[in-house]
Regions:
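Active-site-proximal helix/loop microenvironment
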Residues: 71, 87-95, 180-233
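Short pre-catalytic segments that frame enzyme active sites
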Residues: 30-96, 108-109, 126-128, 186, ...
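Conserved catalytic neighborhood of penicillin-recognizing serine enzymes
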Residues: 63, 110-171, 230-243, 250
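Mid-domain, small-residue-enriched loop/turn segments at the edges of structured enzyme/sensor domains
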Residues: 127-140, 164-204
Length: 330
């Protein structure tokens, strides 16, 4: 690995030399090689510990959108090999619940203090049956919407969206206005779309959470160093961005993201684990420091079978990456 890094650096120096002779500016990579190697090591460690067949981690500088580290790994014949296609591989993710929650808050018809009955963790909506992760243990019963996100209650989020929107198309338009591309191939129901059962690229979810960390400003993710490219100066009302920031912090301090919490730095984020046709994914996306966000980090693992925990698996690696950054990239 290190030989490849040094060779790449050597080639870059040669290219820069030729460029200097021709008075042409060479794009400078945003990737921090030291951090890239650290993230690679932590991701491999997690894959071994959790028995994952795929792993991915993305580190973004919040204010600029500069990609500081990008690692994609998959198992191949008993070995872990790099796979950069994972970054743009659209798939289902329960991280999308946060986007649906923000879209619901934007209508003014719901708030984080509203109460929702999640019953015994099972709810029949039209032809769909929605399960909360703890339905076998009797569910959560009544929850505030703040608690609903903290406990990853699909029922609470679905009810909030249903209360906020009567028109599916208006809901989808709002998501697009917030920078989340529409999955035109999705054939399922509105509730399932809101929960994240459609396909979306990991980088799109990173952009969304980075915008929350950035006070509502969405910037382009980029691998070549330059000034921030603003996609949208404000993806939602300020008060609703602040509500989401509160909810994502609460997820870590009081919800299913406690294993992402660090004694070194205050973090915020959310997780999700979801069954797909090709495996079970454990995702976590968040940012830090909470007081003035500098980095947004996405971590994902894929396992062929249960148990899988977004907070317990991806969340722990998120914490380790955050602490490594605080030690070396202040």
């Amino acid at each position: 690995m290190m030989k490849k890094v040094f060779f790449a650096a050597f080639v870059l120096l040669i290219v820069m030399g030729f460029a200097a002779c021709s008075n042409k500016q060479v794009p400078v990579s945003t990737v921090n090689l030291q951090l890239q190697n650290s993230v690679d090591s932590l991701l491999k460690q997690g894959m071994g510990e959790y028995g994952a067949t795929e792993g991915m981690a993305i580190v973004v500088e919040t204010s600029t959108g500069n990609l500081r580290a990008m690692v994609g790994l998959k198992e191949n014949s008993g070995k872990l090999v790099s796979d950069t296609t994972l970054f743009s591989k659209a798939r289902e993710t329960f991280l999308f619940k946060s986007a649906s929650l923000l879209a619901a808050l934007e209508t003014g018809n719901v708030s984080l203090d509203d109460m929702f009955d999640t019953y015994a963790g099972i709810d029949v909506v039209g032809q769909d049956t929605i399960y909360d992760h703890n339905w076998r243990k009797g569910g959560y019963g009544e929850l505030t919407l703040l608690q609903g996100l903290a406990y990853n209650s699909s029922i609470a989020i679905d009810k909030a969206v249903d209360m906020a929107y009567q028109d599916k198309d208006v809901f989808l338009q709002k998501l697009e206005q917030m920078g989340l591309e529409k999955d035109s191939t999705f054939k399922g129901s509105w509730p399932l779309y809101a929960l994240g059962f459609h396909h979306i690229k990991p980088t799109s979810m990173v952009s969304f959470f980075n915008a929350i960390a950035n006070g509502g400003k969405m910037v382009s993710l980029k691998s070549q160093d330059s000034s921030a490219i603003v996609v949208d100066s404000m993806i939602a009302k300020k008060k609703n961005i602040e509500s989401m920031q509160k909810a994502l912090r609460f997820f870590v301090t009081n919800g299913l993201g406690k294993k992402a919490e660090s004694k070194m730095v205050n973090v915020a984020g959310t997780s999700g684990s979801i069954h797909t046709d090709d495996g079970i994914y454990a995702d976590f996306c968040g940012y830090f420091p909470v007081e003035k966000p500098k980095y947004t980090v996405f971590v994902s693992y894929k396992r062929p079978e249960i148990p899988v925990s977004g907070g317990g698996m991806a969340g722990q690696t998120f914490r380790k990456i955050a602490e490594q950054i605080m030690k070396t990239c202040k």
